[in-house]
Amino acid sequence: QAIRAVTSLPALTGAWRHVGGGILQFPVWEHPYKFDVICRPDLIPEGTQVVNNLQLGRVLTGEQKLNVPIKSMMCWNTNPVTQATESEKILEGLKREDLFLVSAEHFISDTAAFADILLPASMGAEQEDMILSWGHLYLTYNSKCVESPGECLPNNEIFRQLAKRLGYEEENFKWSDSECLENY
């Protein structure tokens, strides 16, 4: 809500009419990153349904139909209830009895509160990663500084363990964090 309030100020004050008085804009096309390399669409099997966060509420409520409806979902690095559009529809969809939700989170967020399974995820200083910043155009290396407390795991490790339990044998599911960074 804070972001919405701040980005409304230029409209409320009329500042948008003056050079430099507009809203904060950081469009994805300004990034010098090669998203097709970072996101590795070549690893997504052909025919896989992809749902954007902007469509999530409509998909979860059945307003927007998919070939195969979502019966289970895993959320990590996102809190759709507060970060996506149509929050009320997302809340309605998360309340479905037939939806199995897993959330990897640091805290019990608005979305994680609906999780059937809540996994303790590590924080930035506790994992090696590459970070796309919202404040500049650099791709930044994040080195691991401290060990994660308790049972917290980096997302990559959660997915490695999940892939192993589900029987995935592809090499990319076995990559270490460093290998993931090298191959992306």
Where are these regions (language model features)?
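Extended redox/cofactor-interaction regions of prokaryotic respiratory oxidoreductases
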Residues: T7-F114, S122-M130, N142
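Basic, amphipathic alpha-helical segments enriched in Lys/Arg and hydrophobic/aromatic residues
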Residues: A2-A11, L162
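Stable alpha-helical elements in mature extracytoplasmic
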Residues: A5, I90, N155-I158
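N-terminal leader/propeptide and maturation segments of large enzyme subunits in energy/redox metabolism
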Residues: C145-Y184
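Structural motif
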Residues: Q1-A2, L66-N67, E151-L153
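Substrate-binding/catalytic subdomain of NAD(P)-dependent oxidoreductase enzymes
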Residues: Q1, P27-E30, E182-Y184
